[in-house]
């Protein structure tokens, strides 16, 4: 088995999230993947690999996510800190959710205000965005692509180990998702993967 490990996953390590009306420690933490890695190292089932840097992960993500959403994620941390340098010490959590399509607002251009953009692309206030969220999500997508390529090349078993959730925000996958749930599997699933039963 080839196991493609997201070496950047720990860069997405939120401090707090909103849960049932109060701020709590984040539920989705790097330790979740660390436990799996420790077990895989205890009973080796295959090499831990990193994706080839030459993979065109940006093109693959663009096949399943809207360009404005990807552009937002790529610049979100910079924009958050530009609002207030003190934000560098805080995770970004949305506080408003402009429901543009529901209320007939324009959807062809993102809002100029960062807080509105954050809310437009966020699913909830339970998933903070931090300095390393984009790098972690992008590397997770690369892991999914590498595993798909390995399967297409004949590898019987390939795993993308990346704190992955296969379901992006319901019905809004192209333009919003929980940051750690950037739909990493979708680029791989958009490929014509043959059956691996043989």
Where are these regions (language model features)?
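HDAC/HDAC-like amidohydrolase catalytic core signature
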Residues: 1-197
């Amino acid at each position: 088995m080839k196991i493609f490990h997201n070496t950047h996953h720990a860069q997405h390590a939120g401090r707090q999230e909103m849960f049932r009306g109060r701020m709590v420690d984040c539920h989705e933490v790097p330790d979740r993947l660390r436990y799996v890695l420790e077990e895989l190292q205890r009973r080796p089932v295959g090499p831990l690999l990193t994706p080839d840097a030459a993979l065109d992960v940006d093109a693959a993500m663009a096949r399943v996510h809207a360009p404005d959403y990807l552009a937002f994620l790529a610049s979100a941390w910079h924009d958050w800190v530009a609002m207030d340098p003190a934000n560098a010490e805080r995770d970004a959590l949305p506080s408003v959710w402009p429901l543009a399509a529901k209320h007939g607002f324009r959807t062809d251009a993102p809002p100029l205000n960062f807080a509105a953009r954050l809310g437009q692309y966020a699913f909830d206030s339970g998933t903070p965005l931090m300095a390393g969220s984009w790098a972690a999500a992008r590397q997770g997508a690369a892991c999914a692509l590498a595993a798909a390529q390995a399967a297409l090349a004949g590898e019987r078993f390939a795993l993308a180990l990346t704190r992955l959730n296969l379901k992006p925000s319901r019905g809004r996958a192209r333009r919003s998702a929980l940051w750690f749930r950037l739909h990493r599997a979708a680029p791989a699933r958009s490929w014509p993967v043959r059956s691996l039963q043989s």
